[in-house]
């Protein structure tokens, strides 16, 4: 999977819709003077992939990602970012493997309402994270390395490094499936206990009538 383009509207300094195209071969470099919004492009990518930690978006609250207005432009009512990936080899979950392109969209309104979409279909944040599981692309993945990140990894705790290594090794998906299965098993066990209690109560009532 490779990033094909990113569409940004009302996000941070992007008051007007902007569509950035990325080369499918080689390296794309975003250049410009200080304060022109280069870091906001990276923030937009991280945000649309499900980043929930405001400090990693360089803001005080999540609403800070919505364009706040300027001397010449009114504040935006929402922020929207859409990130399109080329998927020629079907390197995704089976339900999206047949798509040659996958577009992930995130919207945030000033009311606090948040919307996620995959190929224009509303989904949950969980679905977005599962889509990129084991690819390193997610908001907390190893594909986005900002200033100071290498130092953080070197000085991080063993458990934190283990999480990063597991992601790179491609075993996060299997751990997630195991945890999901264990949770369902626990729920099924609890339901079975409740059914057993109900059957026991009914049996006692039946014996009382006899």
Where are each of the predicted segments found?
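Gly/Lys-enriched N-terminal cap/neck module of very large, oligomeric protein machines
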Residues: 2-210
């Amino acid at each position: 999977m490779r990033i094909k383009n990113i569409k940004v509207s009302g996000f941070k300094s992007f008051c007007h819709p902007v569509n950035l195209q990325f080369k499918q071969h080689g390296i794309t470099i975003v250049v410009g003077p200080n304060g022109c919004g280069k870091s906001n492009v990276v923030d937009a990518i991280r945000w649309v992939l499900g980043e929930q930690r405001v400090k990693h978006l360089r803001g005080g609250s999540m609403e800070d990602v919505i364009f706040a207005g300027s001397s010449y432009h009114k504040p935006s009512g929402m922020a929207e970012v859409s990130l399109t990936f080329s998927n020629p080899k079907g390197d995704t979950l089976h339900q999206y493997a047949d798509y040659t392109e996958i577009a992930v969209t995130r919207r945030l309104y000033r009311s606090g309402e948040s919307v996620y979409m995959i190929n224009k279909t509303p989904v949950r944040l969980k679905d977005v994270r599962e889509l990129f599981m084991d690819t390193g692309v997610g908001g907390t993945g190893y594909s986005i390395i900002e200033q100071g990140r290498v130092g953080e990894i070197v000085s991080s705790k063993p458990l934190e490094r283990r999480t990063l290594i597991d992601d790179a090794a491609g075993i996060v998906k299997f751990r997630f499936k195991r945890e999901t299965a264990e949770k369902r098993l626990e729920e099924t066990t609890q339901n079975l206990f409740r059914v057993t209690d109900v059957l026991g109560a009914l049996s006692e009532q039946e014996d009382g009538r006899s």
